[in-house]
């Protein structure tokens, strides 16, 4: 029996070092010595060699490419059957066939580690049935605009902080019902919110950018003596993510007001939040203003480095790196990995390879994360042979590959439609004791969606449930979208129903996918109901084809629907959407008037 491609590639480990060295030499666009210089410095009383970067060289544009994408191989029929055998499970529809007892050792995966997936788990002793009962009341009565609070009063709940946190977690994408429940609980006799429940509500307000309410809640916590460092961190990250630099810095003043110490960890948190929001320049300005008031540590320089790398400013990144060394700090593996990612993000692939080579020869030795960064980039560029060489080199170095590395390879081979190789990788993951995680499952679901194979995505989902891996909101959104794209509207709605049944709160993307699918199906009235639900919950107005959506009601001569939507949008602060709906209402009224005159 012929060996699978993955096994064939894995057996070539004896020649890995030679091939890797050859690849490094052949791909050089200029000498590594010119790019990275070493000089002897005394660090911490020891004479050691430090890697320094020539910032001027980063300004050059390197046109040569180190990648040689291979021709895609058509998907063999046997590969589909192989995956089907391993993933054959019941779909969302109750009328589907029974679960198959195929190979349990096969699972699926993905390599998208920049994406937020997953639902945070809350450790608690609360009865899940009680949480479900409360959430059902909130969901149903809020949607009907009924007196939710009165019904909650009648339930005679034994309120606990665990219960409040779990209910808020379920409504973390729907700030209005979450906040109403939070306020109702605050008024119950014998119950008082704690720092934990306040911070849960703060997180929801921060995520939905309800900054005025968020600050009011923060100040209320201050008057009750319930503020924690987590509270300030939530607020700082929220303002930074919204690119509100001045307001983010203003949190320092609130910390002073409530007698909280502003130390290096707090400043690092703010600098990191600004950097992640691609405000590297603003983070640098803030650091320059504050650097005389505190002692920067390794993390301080690393978050500044990351901020510049995220905006692809390698000249400033090199300056921070060298400044770190000048202040007696030796860049650790985290800093090296940040620089590796920065070089790859800035399309300096050959330079990243050189830095990786220097790390191997002079330290710090690459860790699993270092190899994952390199392998992920090779996979994105379809350079799978090189990705395998790096994987083999990692194993030869004594490092144990984790699920993230396998996920990158699975995504790379899956994109090339080499599902037989994907199968072997999944099998090896199980054999090596690194079972697929949630991101791994999401990766293969994404591959199936991209290849317009939603049924396979459903099988993967069922395998995920079978292996007790909790699906994320992203999991459902991908499968639902793939069905709507395939015009299988019944299954698209079935995915939505499954998500609600699982107790997962739909986010903005979930509603957008569903509303677009319903409009495409010609069910604009049903889409209108979900749009109203979004507005009532205080969620963002979805990016949909409003003209197509409105045209159905316009033809039917129903201006009152637009007027109702305009009113709801305006009440929710969605003024742009309100204006669109109001304009369509006027157009529809004029059309109705013309018809009446003609009759």
From Swiss-Prot:
InterPro entries, sorted: Pentatricopeptide_rpt, PROP1-like_PPR_dom, TPR-like_helical_dom_sf
Organism lineage string: Eukaryota, Viridiplantae, Streptophyta, Embryophyta, Tracheophyta
Highest taxon above the source species: Eukaryota
Span of the transit peptide along the chain: 1-99
Compartments it resides in: Mitochondrion
Family (UniProt): Belongs to the PPR family. P subfamily.
Recorded GO CC terms: mitochondrion
Protein name: Pentatricopeptide repeat-containing protein At3g62540, mitochondrial
PANTHER family per record: PENTATRICOPEPTIDE REPEAT-CONTAINING PROTEIN 4, MITOCHONDRIAL-RELATED, RESPIRATORY COMPLEX I CHAPERONE (CIA84), PUTATIVE (AFU_ORTHOLOGUE AFUA_2G06020)-RELATED
Organism of origin: Arabidopsis thaliana (Mouse-ear cress)
Pfam families: PPR, PPR_2, PPR_long
Keywords: Mitochondrion, Repeat, Transit peptide
Keyword Mitochondrion: yes
PPR repeat placement: 194-228, 230-262, 263-293, 297-331, 332-366, 367-401, 402-436, 437-471, 472-506, 507-541
């Amino acid at each position: 029996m012929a060996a699978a491609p993955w096994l064939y590639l894995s057996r070539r480990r004896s020649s890995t070092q030679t091939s890797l060295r050859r690849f490094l030499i052949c791909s050089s666009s200029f000498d590594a010595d010119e790019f990275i210089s070493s000089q002897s410095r005394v660090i911490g009383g020891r004479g050691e060699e430090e890697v320094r970067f020539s910032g001027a060289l980063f300004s050059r544009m390197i046109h040569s490419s180190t990648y040689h994408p291979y021709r895609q191989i058509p998907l063999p029929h046997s590969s589909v059957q192989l995956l089907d055998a391993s993933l054959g499970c019941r779909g969302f529809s109750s009328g589907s066939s029974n679960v198959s007892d195929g190979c349990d050792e096969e699972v699926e995966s993905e390599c998208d580690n920049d994406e937020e997936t997953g639902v945070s788990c809350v450790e608690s002793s609360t009865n899940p049935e009680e949480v479900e009962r409360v959430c059902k009341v909130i969901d149903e009565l809020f949607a009907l605009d009924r007196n939710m609070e009165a019904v909650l009063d009648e339930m005679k709940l034994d309120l606990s902080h665990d219960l409040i946190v779990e209910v808020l977690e379920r409504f973390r994408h729907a700030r209005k019902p979450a906040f109403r429940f939070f306020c109702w609980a605050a008024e119950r006799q014998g119950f008082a919110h704690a720092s934990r429940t306040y911070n849960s509500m703060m997180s929801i307000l921060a995520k939905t950018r309800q900054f005025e309410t968020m600050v009011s809640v923060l100040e209320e916590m201050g008057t009750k003596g319930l503020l924690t460092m987590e509270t300030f961190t939530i607020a700082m990250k929220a303002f930074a993510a919204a690119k509100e630099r001045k307001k983010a810095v203003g949190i320092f003043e609130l910390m002073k007001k409530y007698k909280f110490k502003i130390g290096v960890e707090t400043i690092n948190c703010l600098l990191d939040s600004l950097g992640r929001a691609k405000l590297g320049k603003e983070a640098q300005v803030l650091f320059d203003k504050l650097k005389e008031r505190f002692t920067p540590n390794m993390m301080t320089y690393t978050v500044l480095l990351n901020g510049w790398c995220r905006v692809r400013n390698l000249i400033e990144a090199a300056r921070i790196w060298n400044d770190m060394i000048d202040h007696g700090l030796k860049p650790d593996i985290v800093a090296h990995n940040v620089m590796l990612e920065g070089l790859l993000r800035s399309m300096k692939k050959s330079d990243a390879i050189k830095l990786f080579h220097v790390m191997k020869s002079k330290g710090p030795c690459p860790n699993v994360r270092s190899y994952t960064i390199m392998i992920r980039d090779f996979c994105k560029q379809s350079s799978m042979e090189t990705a395998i060489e790096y994987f083999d080199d990692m194993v030869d170095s004594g490092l144990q590959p984790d699920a993230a590395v396998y996920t990158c390879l699975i995504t790379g081979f899956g994109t090339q439609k080499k599902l037989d190789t994907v199968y072997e990788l999944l099998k090896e993951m199980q054999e090596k004791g690194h079972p697929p995680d949630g991101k791994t499952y999401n990766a293969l679901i994404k591959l199936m969606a991209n290849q317009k194979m939603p049924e396979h995505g459903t099988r993967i989902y069922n395998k995920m449930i079978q292996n007790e891996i909790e699906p994320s909101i992203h999991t459902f959104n991908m499968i639902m979208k793939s069905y709507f794209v395939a015009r299988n509207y019944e299954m698209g709605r079935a995915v939505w129903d499954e998500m609600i049944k699982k107790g997962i709160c739909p986010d903005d993307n979930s509603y957008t996918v569903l509303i677009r699918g319903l409009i495409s199906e010609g069910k604009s009235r049903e889409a209108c109901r979900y749009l109203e639900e979004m507005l009532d919950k205080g969620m963002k107005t979805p990016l949909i084809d409003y003209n197509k959506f409105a045209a159905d009601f316009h033809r039917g001569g129903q201006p009152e629907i637009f007027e109702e939507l305009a009113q709801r949008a305006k009440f929710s602060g969605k003024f742009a959407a309100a204006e669109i709906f109001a304009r369509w209402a006027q157009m529809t009224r004029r059309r109705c008037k013309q018809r009446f005159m003609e009759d």
